[in-house]
Amino acid sequence: MQQSTLLKPVSCYGIGVHTGKRTQLTIEPAKENTGIIFIRTDISSENNYIEASYYNVSDTLLSTTISNNHKIQVSTIEHLMAALWGCSIDNAVIKIDGPEVPIMDGSSKPFVFMIECAGKKLQNAPKKYLKILKEIKVVNKDCELYCTPSEHITVDLTIDFSSKAIGKQNLNFGVQESFTKNIADARTFGFIKDVEYLKSKGLAQGASFENAIGIDEHDKVLNPSGLRYADEFVRHKLLDLFGDLYTSGISIVSAIKGYKTSHAFNNELLHKIFSDTTSYKFVTSNELS
C-alpha cells in the first residue's frame, strides 16, 4: 500500500466553536513523507507553520491545540485530523487564516466530504504503520486508556456520564468497520450550563445547536433534530480518539481500550508509546498479516 495525498486543493469557510470567528481553511496536496502540516496564512512570518504532532500539543482542556516554538497555534484540530485518518490521507498542508479550525457541524463529516470532493492520489512511497509490541497504559483514578499488540486496529471504548441523556455507552470498532460511514458524522456535545459559563469566560463563542448537541439541566437533548444515533456520544468520543492519535503522524496498529478518555489522556498515551522504543516498530502493509 502506498502513501496518499489529495488530488487538488479544497477549501471551506466556517466559525470557530470557541473564538466565534469566521475562518477559511484549505487542504492542499503535499509531497511524500510530509505528514500533516498547518500553516497560519494570517501571520506573515516564516514561523507560521506547525507540524500536527503529539509533541506540539500545547493544550487539551476543551479541544486539542498545537503550537510551535514561536507560540503560533491552531486549536480544535481533532475533527479534521480524524477525517484525514479516516480517509487515509498521509500527507497534506492545511492553510488556515485564523487560530481555530472551523467547527462546521461539530463532526468530521464535512471534512470527509471535502477530501472526497478533492479526490485521493497515491504516491511513490510505501505507507507505514506503527505496530504496538507490548501493552502501554495510562491511568488516572477511574479513567484509563491502553493499547496492546494486535494485527489490526480495534477499539473498545466506554464513556460514563451521570447525565441520563448520555449515561454509560460502549462501542467496539473493528477492522471491518467504516469510519466515514459509522463514526464521522457523530457530533460534539456539551451541557448548556457549562456552555453559559464558558461564554462568560470568552470561550464557546461560536457554539450553537448547528454545531453541537446541547443537553439541559433536565437531561434533555435540546437539538430540534435530535440525535443522529442513540449512541452518538460515544461515537464522537471515538472520533476524538482517532483524531488525537493521528497526531502520532502515522496509523497505529493495536487493540485499544479506553474508559472515560479525554484529549489529555489520548495525548499522554502517545507520549508514553514514543518514550519507549521497545514498545513499537514501524512496518509496511506487507508486514501486517
UniProtKB/Swiss-Prot annotation:
NCBIfam families in the cross-refs: lpxC
Gene3D superfamilies, alphabetized: lpxc deacetylase, domain 1, lpxc deacetylase, domain 2
Similarity comment: family membership: Belongs to the LpxC family.
Amino acids binding Zn(2+): H79, H236, D240
E.C. number: 3.5.1.108
Gene Ontology CC terms, in alphabetical order: membrane
Keyword Metal-binding: yes
Keywords annotated in UniProt: Hydrolase, Lipid A biosynthesis, Lipid biosynthesis, Lipid metabolism, Metal-binding, Zinc
Pathway, per record: Glycolipid biosynthesis; lipid IV(A) biosynthesis; lipid IV(A) from (3R)-3-hydroxytetradecanoyl-[acyl-carrier-protein] and UDP-N-acetyl-alpha-D-glucosamine: step 2/6
Function: Catalyzes the hydrolysis of UDP-3-O-myristoyl-N-acetylglucosamine to form UDP-3-O-myristoylglucosamine and acetate, the committed step in lipid A biosynthesis.
Named cofactor requirement(s): Zn(2+)
Active site: H263
GO biological process, one term: lipid A biosynthetic process
Protein name as catalogued: UDP-3-O-acyl-N-acetylglucosamine deacetylase
GO molecular function, one term: UDP-3-O-acyl-N-acetylglucosamine deacetylase activity
Reaction catalysis annotation: a UDP-3-O-[(3R)-3-hydroxyacyl]-N-acetyl-alpha-D-glucosamine + H2O = a UDP-3-O-[(3R)-3-hydroxyacyl]-alpha-D-glucosamine + acetate
Matches recorded under InterPro entries: Ribosomal_Su5_D2-typ_SF (IPR020568), UDP-acyl_GlcNac_deAcase (IPR004463), UDP-acyl_GlcNac_deAcase_C (IPR011334), UDP-acyl_N-AcGlcN_deAcase_N (IPR015870)
Species for this entry: Rickettsia typhi (strain ATCC VR-144 / Wilmington)
